[in-house]
Amino acid sequence: ACKFGLLLKLLEDEDVNTLSSFRPILPNMDNNIFYGNSLLGPNDVPVEFAEEINPFDFGERRFDLIVGNPPYMKTEDIKKFSPNEKKLYEKNNRYVSAHKQYDKYFLFVERAVNLLKKNGYLGYIIPSKFMKVGAASTLRKLITDNKLLKIITSFGAHQVFEGKSNYTCIMILQKNEHDQFKYSEVEDFAAWRIRTEGAYSFCNREASILSENTWVLYTDKHKHLLDKITRN
């Protein structure tokens, strides 16, 4: 489906007069698109579960850039969908982020970090709740202990995905230590989409303010409101 979608994109501007050259211009994508369970490798999965789980072998591949929108799936749904898969995520502390009532996207963040080259970048759009829920404490610890956080852009109450009710953010990590990170809040989503000036507010924050505990983030623009609430 992914390959077919990309090929359709290539044909967007074609018409009846150019379709005769359609076949030659289509690239062979067999060496560019792969599929499988990227959270588990062949050595992680018993032979009897291999067909069900379809582990993916990255081998020694490491990446300069990983970008994506990983699946959001609660622990209960992982167990319902594939109980054998859930057990393997939690086996022998394979994923430190497989903690309490974790969400599957926690694992994707951890996996991506481990697949980055030194100085490599990870950019994911994920639910903002990982900054607050107790189950994500081990994921927050992984990020903060290694000072990976570079940028977080919060969409607040703006709904990024049509027909879905998710409160999301874009998180950018770099496999290098950062003493500061940039935090921004989108105030006008429609304006932000076309990169209009003033669509968001931002500030730089010290990495030392973050730990495995709940992340309370705000821009300078909203600091006075938080101070007022705190005083009261």
Predicted regions and their residues:
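SAM-dependent methyltransferase catalytic region
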Residues: 1-152, 157, 170-172, 176-201, ...
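Short glycine/serine/proline-enriched coil/turn segments at secondary-structure junctions
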Residues: 160-163
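Conserved short internal alpha-helix adjacent to the catalytic or cofactor-binding core
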Residues: 165-169
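Long, low-complexity segments enriched in small/aliphatic residues
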Residues: 208-232
